[in-house]
């Protein structure tokens, strides 16, 4: 382990070149016009002061706030298989303050690095995928960290569809045709829509589990995610319980 740490941290090697070769090989094996690019964050529990970007933040692995490092990852999936294709370390904003100056030097943090939110890091990676043209894809999927970010969604490539999780307290406008009347109504939370007795649910197979199919009730409702009435703000809201 120590030898690997020395190799990764002290020896000179072209990380960008290795990552580029990895993408080329994955693309050669997996790329497909109907491919899916998935965005997610993942954390590693970390203690001490000798590792960059360690902070008291949400750790998805533990489901609670803990000292950890957090990264944003990009995966590619097609009918041919799946693989991770890119990554960015998320550096919390406080790490750029004066009180962290010595720790930045000790951890050899690049001086030109600037703070970026996780959705920004994800957008950068997706834009790089499009720029290189190695991977064909039609879909982008993400969880609430990215689905709740209007900037992330607005900056996605125009040619892709997006399946994004959003928070249950997110407010949207129900499309008038699906309301009892066509008058402009106030926004409602996703959880309130899910509790509405008028919503029709259908039992569907969600996935294949180790002990058989995983079933759940699903529904969909046409909504506006922003200024109601504008066609560009219309979305399908998919519900599951």
Regions found by a protein language model. Give the residues of each.
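Long, contiguous hydrophobic alpha-helical segments, chiefly transmembrane helices and signal peptides
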Residues: 4-7, 37-38, 54, 58, ...
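Active-site-proximal, Lys/Arg-enriched surface segment
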Residues: 12-93, 104, 221-227
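Short, well-ordered loop/turn elements at secondary-structure boundaries
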Residues: 31-33, 68, 134-136, 156-159, ...
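An anionic, glycine-rich sequence signature occurring as long contiguous blocks
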Residues: 80-107, 111, 165-241
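Electropositive nucleic-acid engagement tracts
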Residues: 1-49, 128, 163, 181-208
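Bulky hydrophobic/aromatic packing residues
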Residues: 13, 37-38, 44, 58, ...
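Electropositive, glycine- and tryptophan-enriched low-complexity nucleic-acid-binding patches
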Residues: 2-6, 61-137, 234-241
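Domain-level cores of phosphate- or acyl-group-handling catalytic modules
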Residues: 103-182
């Amino acid at each position: 382990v120590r030898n690997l740490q020395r190799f990764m941290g002290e020896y000179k090697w072209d990380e960008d070149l290795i990552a580029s070769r990895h993408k080329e090989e994955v693309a050669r094996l997996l790329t497909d016009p109907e491919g899916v690019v998935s965005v997610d964050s993942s954390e590693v529990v970390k203690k001490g002061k000798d590792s960059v970007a360690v902070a008291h933040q949400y750790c998805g692995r533990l489901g609670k706030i803990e000292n950890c490092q957090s990264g944003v990852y990009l995966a590619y999936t097609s009918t041919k298989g799946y693989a991770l294709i890119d990554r960015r370390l998320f550096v919390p904003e406080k790490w750029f303050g004066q009180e962290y100056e010595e720790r930045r030097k000790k951890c050899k943090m690049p001086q030109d690095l600037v703070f970026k939110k996780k959705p920004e890091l994800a957008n950068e990676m997706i834009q790089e995928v499009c720029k290189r043209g190695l991977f064909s894809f039609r879909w982008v999927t993400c969880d609430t960290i990215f689905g709740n970010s209007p900037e992330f969604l607005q900056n996605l490539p125009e040619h892709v569809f997006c399946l994004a999780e959003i928070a249950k307290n997110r407010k949207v406008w129900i499309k008038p045709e699906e309301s009892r009347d066509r008058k402009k109504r106030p926004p409602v939370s996703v959880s309130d829509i899910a509790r509405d007795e008028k919503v029709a649910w259908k039992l569907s197979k969600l996935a294949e589990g180790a002990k058989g199919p995983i079933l759940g009730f699903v529904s969909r409702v046409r909504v506006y995610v922003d200024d109601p009435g504008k066609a560009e703000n219309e979305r399908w809201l998919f519900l599951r319980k």
